[in-house]
Regions:
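Long amphipathic alpha-helical segments
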Residues: 1-65
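Short glycine-rich or small-residue beta-strand-to-loop segments that form or flank ligand, phosphate
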Residues: 19-20, 46, 86-92, 141-143, ...
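Short glycine/serine/threonine-rich phosphate/pyrophosphate-binding segments
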Residues: 28-30, 96-101, 125-126, 145-154, ...
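Glycine-rich oxoanion-binding loops at beta->alpha junctions
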Residues: 70-74, 113-134, 179-180, 196
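Glycine-rich phosphate/diphosphate-binding loop of Rossmann-like nucleotide-binding domains
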Residues: 84-126
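C-terminal binding/interaction regions
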Residues: 91, 95, 133-136, 140, ...
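Glycine-rich phosphate-binding loop
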Residues: 130-168
Length: 219
């Protein structure tokens, strides 16, 4: 392919194969890259930020599962979880679910058990407390929120595991497209919180998987 160079050894180096970032690529380019990865014996191919049009085009040639909400495509089967523990993906609101599903599906593609806790934001603390057992038993937590982004700080003050904070662009004017949530998360008083870019569910899911596999893979 003249337009792309596959990193066929990434799985060997990092334990996780290359991902296709669909935004900015034509449907033809996405298909050719995915086909090349399948030919290189990749059992599962993850495609992020994929349009529905591209999904229909690729799906006509490959075994593709497409998630409309997160605009994520998966060629092949999601593997059996082999991570050490569970990854919890929590959102402040229902509006954060597109980013959350990108994170959750990414983690699942890389062999992790994922627990989804959606719409458990700080406006109703009881909703979060109803899931305290899930939070305290997690190996790593992905906390996703827009508005003021307080969810990550609250979870970070409760959990004894790493928390990956994901600011989203959900919110009104002074949210500044997710900047307010990003700054809140970066300035959190709670320890053990790391922050990825605005709406970067993929980055959070990928990092969560790396943490969940630090002690090797579960047999």
């Amino acid at each position: 392919m003249g337009f792309a160079k596959l990193d066929t050894h990434r799985g060997i180096r990092q334990g996780m194969a290359e991902v296709i970032y669909g935004a900015g690529k034509t449907k033809e380019q996405i298909l050719k890259i995915a086909q090349a990865m399948v030919e290189e014996r990749e059992k599962t191919v993850l495609i992020t930020r994929m349009s529905k049009e591209a999904a229909e085009y690729v799906g006509a040639s490959l075994d593709l599962h497409y998630d409309d909400l997160s605009r994520t495509g998966i060629v092949g089967q999601i593997p059996k979880p082999d991570g050490v523990g569970k990854i919890v993906v929590a959102t402040g609101g229902t509006s954060d679910m597109p980013v959350a599903e990108e994170a959750a599906l990414t983690a699942q593609v890389y062999g992790n058990e994922v627990v989804r806790l959606y719409d458990v934001g700080v406006a109703g603390m009881h909703r979060l407390m109803d899931h305290i057992e899930d939070i305290m038993s997690a190996r790593v937590i992905v906390a996703i929120a827009g508005m003021e982004g307080a969810l990550a700080s609250v979870i970070g003050g409760m959990a004894d595991c790493p928390v990956i904070a994901v600011p989203t662009s959900v919110g009104y004017g002074a949210n500044f497209g997710g900047l307010s949530a990003l700054l809140s998360m970066l300035n959190s008083c709670a320890s053990g919180i790391s922050v990825v870019n605005i709406d970067n569910g993929f980055g959070a899911g990928y990092l969560a998987s790396m943490i969940n596999h630090l002690e090797g893979r579960k047999e």
